[in-house]
Amino acid sequence: SSTGFSLQAMDSSHVALVALLLRSEGFEHYRCDRNISMGMNLNNMAKMLKCAGNDDIITIKADDGSDTVTFMFESPTQDKISDFEMKLMDIDSEHLGIPEAEYHAIVKMPSSEFARICKDLSSIGDTVVISVTKEGVKFSTKGDIGTANIVCRQNTSVDKPEEATVIEMNEPVSLTFALRYMNSFTKATPLSNTVTISLSNELPVVVEYKIAEMGYVRFYLAPKIEEDEEDTKPQV
């Protein structure tokens, strides 16, 4: 749209959703004459983006009504220009309007610390219980070889704000999530020094990484219900 570029994707089991926003003012040049919605295969898009050099300038172009989108990669010295045209997909589902919710607990912590916790716990178990109380935020798991508990207490007396752990809690929360999804989410760690985790009982967790001066990427994951059988999963 004229205000920015937004992307949504959901996994096949409808348990996880990713929402990306890049605001128009963050681009060097941005023009959108009318709102346009495009269906893209993420694997195919990733293949094309991997053809770009680390310092290339990327231009994305699409015409209204066209069944393709063009990715143009220009080297910094402008001595090499590559054009890749990708076929679009027909996707029935509309862009989801995700309502803003009031969360019982919001945890802001270093993104590298969150990634390390998820990686460490996944060597013990398949799920993580995230509990927020006035004591702090606790990440727990159990598996065949034993159990693990990691507690992060509020820590705002750090010189560097990006290394602080800040917890806002209206009421205690305890929810269980699949670690394989959490580990996928932490691949966004290089985007931001901090991650914000928003939790409410019965609602999907929101794991948000801010993209400096441009927008954010948010991951939504439905909690696991312990009594449920493996094949009956709650949906986002």
From Swiss-Prot:
It comes from the Eukaryota. The keyword Cell membrane does not apply. Keywords: DNA replication, DNA-binding, Nucleus. GO terms for cellular component: PCNA complex. One of its GO terms (molecular function) is DNA binding. InterPro entries: DNA_clamp_sf, Pr_cel_nuc_antig, Pr_cel_nuc_antig_C, Pr_cel_nuc_antig_CS, Pr_cel_nuc_antig_N. Its main location: nucleus. One of its GO terms (biological process) is translesion synthesis. The keyword Iron does not apply. Pfam families: PCNA_C, PCNA_N. It is found in: Nucleus. PROSITE patterns: PCNA_1, PCNA_2. Residues 31-50 bind DNA. This protein is an auxiliary protein of DNA polymerase delta and is involved in the control of eukaryotic DNA replication by increasing the polymerase's processibility during elongation of the leading strand. Belongs to the PCNA family. This is Proliferating cell nuclear antigen. It comes from Glycine max (Soybean).
